[in-house]
Structures are given as structure tokens and as C-alpha cells.
Amino acid sequence: MSQNNRDFAEITKIASDELDVVRVSRPCCDKYYITAHPAKDGRQYSMFENLGRFLRKHNAGIVTQDVFGGCELYADGMDALSRACGAVDWPVTWIEGYGLAPKKLTGTQVYAISGLSVQPVRLDGRIVGGVFEDDDARYCLLGDLRPTDTSCSRAEQARATLEKIEVALATIDMGFSDVVRTWFYINEILSWYDEFNMVRNKLFEERGVFEGVVPASTGVGVANPAGAAVVAEVFAVKAKNSHNVGISAVASP
């Protein structure tokens, strides 16, 4: 943020039985990190209703969203989400943890913002992210990036997903050099994680990523409704003012 904005930042927590929210408030905007839980009475989609009410109350829009639940619930869940929150014009990364009951939802996490305009990032006819900016930087969050062809090999799907990240970033004048964080949700991760890393490292070498700041990354073993070998999320930052915004590597714990 700019010098003026950085001088005035307030972090508050809002908690209830249904919602846990961390709000970061600055003169330019409010950012909301929201976790919503299903109702204890078994009404799973109530978490979307509570989310929608919160967003309307605070005049906030969703940039990206994760849903943790059975893949069988995807179609009905997306309908419930749109009824509660309006047209879904942001990426929803829907993932199912191993051992989860196929008809169970466990929660949703949302990054939302008010006070700044969020422009959608589109790729292949889908909204795959949002981009917004302040005086010092442009920020991009991408989600639900996955291969179009899920019948090809897992290595080919991994390569296709990485290339989609690159293409999506290029539409907003960003590249891998601007990526600070990646999340890869990998189906059957233990059976091919080494292979996935080989594919990722090869592309990073080709693009010169290892010559700069390498994005922090997390790999998680989960399934997805598309049946893809991998689904990705990305956070990228492109500084306008290097005096106030900087990206640097930190040691891994």
C-alpha cells in the first residue's frame, strides 16, 4: 500500500457460530478473509446464505472462493451459492478431501473486498480470477485453473494448467515473475507428486522463474468435480512503487 495507506491499517476479527472474518481496513478499501460454516442443524447451504448477507451488509464483492465439500454436491451447491450471493462472477475452487463423505460440506473460504473496483480475469470463456489495484501495486488472484482435457496424462494436465496460469496472467500484463504464491490441489497426490514437480520445474526453468523470486507454494491432495489431475490458485503482485511494495523470499521453516 502507499505510505499514507500503510500508516492507517486496522485489523479486526468478526466471529459467530456461522462466520469467522478477519477484516483489514485501510483508507482505500476493506479486505475480508471469510470462513463460513454449515449450520449445525444440517442445513449445509446455509453457509452461502450467511455469506451473502454479510457481503451485502458490507457492500463487498468476492474475488476468489474455495469450497470444501463432496464433489457430488457441486451442481446443487453452485445453484445454492448463486441464489444466496447472486451471479457467480468469480472463480470457485471446489475441492473434496480424502475420506470426506461425498454428500457433505465442511465450509467455504472467501477473499472479498470493498472500496476498490475488481476487474474479472477471463480465460477460455470462464472467469478465472480478479485483479484490483491501489497507488502502489496491482494485485491478482486466480482460481479454479485446470486442464481443459482431463483425458490426457497427468503430466500433460499439469503442464496445461501451468500454461493456463501463464496465459491468464498475460491478459492483465503479468507473468510468472509477478507470482508470489501458488496452491496446487492435486488428485491422488502421493502417486505422482514427484512427476508433478518435474513438470513444474521444467516450465519454471524454461521461463527463467528460478532466476528470480520463486513463488511460495503448497501442494494438497484433494479431488475436484472436473476430475482433473490438478487445479491451481495463484496470487500475483506487480509493484508500481518499489519503495513501498517489495517481494522477497523467506526461509522455509
Region spans (language model):
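Short, polar/acidic, helix-capping and beta-turn segments at strand->helix junctions
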Residues: 1-253
